[in-house]
Amino acid sequence: MPWIQLRINTNSDDAETISDLLMEEGSVSITFEDGKDTPIFEPKLGETPLWRDTVVVALFEADTDLTPTIEMLKTLPFLGDNFSHKIEQIEDKDWVREWMDNFHPIQFGSRLWICPSWREIPDPTAVNVILDPGLAFGTGTHPTTALCLEWLDSLDLSNEEVIDFGCGSGILAVAALKLGAKKVTGIDIDYQAIDASRANAERNNVADKLALYLPEDQPADLKADVLVANILAGPLRELAPLIAERVKSGGKLALSGLLKEQAQEISDFYSQWFDMDEAAHKEDWSRLTGKRK
């Protein structure tokens, strides 16, 4: 059946309130869109990242009368009688199938492929990681993830111990293991990320070589030959002494989650522990690499 879509122009302060009210009114789906093509920088931990100008998009069943909902919204002091909104009917689709069709196998570097489970593997002789979009961040499509995957592919990880700091979906940890790492330790602040990393490691038959920890549970004496941290500039700076401590002398480091304009500052800061290389860039994002002094 077709659906009714209600789009409301608002701001980041009120978007969550509107979302909650629309769910109470019977919306079957709520999404947030960028109202003015403005990049999100660093949301605080635990917060939903929202743009200053946000569009709340609510989906309702086709037979829903939205008149009472619109009248209710008009009573909200931060919206008022003439709030900006649009109602339209959208065609019925197999939304799951359409979503799946958007994901294809992607190659990173010379050896590594990330493949959704429902797609045929393009090169069975390559290093193939089976990973579906789902829990936690990281499917290879974001530039920072791609930069890290390309870096891992460029290394000889045979018999190396690796730390994935901020492991998210586990994509980097699993890729490192498939590329020959002896052991990988994944660390993340989110239980959901730990679960997602474990599930993806099991799917790729490398779970026996992956250790996963919340930050407070990581071993005090943990060290690795290679450390990759795809997080954000703020945490990278705050955690720099700990990250440096985790890398063995002569070990390799990759940092991402950085915008281009943030890269030089972070590189300079890490240079007290590492010999830093020139930054690599993809779109508006950067990756820093270095060798432990």
UniProtKB/Swiss-Prot annotation:
Coiled coil: none annotated. Keywords: Cytoplasm, Methyltransferase, S-adenosyl-L-methionine, Transferase. It catalyses: L-lysyl-[protein] + 3 S-adenosyl-L-methionine = N(6),N(6),N(6)-trimethyl-L-lysyl-[protein] + 3 S-adenosyl-L-homocysteine + 3 H(+). GO terms for biological process: methylation. It comes from the Bacteria. S-adenosyl-L-methionine binds at residues 145, 166, 188, 230. PANTHER family: ELECTRON TRANSFER FLAVOPROTEIN BETA SUBUNIT LYSINE METHYLTRANSFERASE. This is Ribosomal protein L11 methyltransferase.
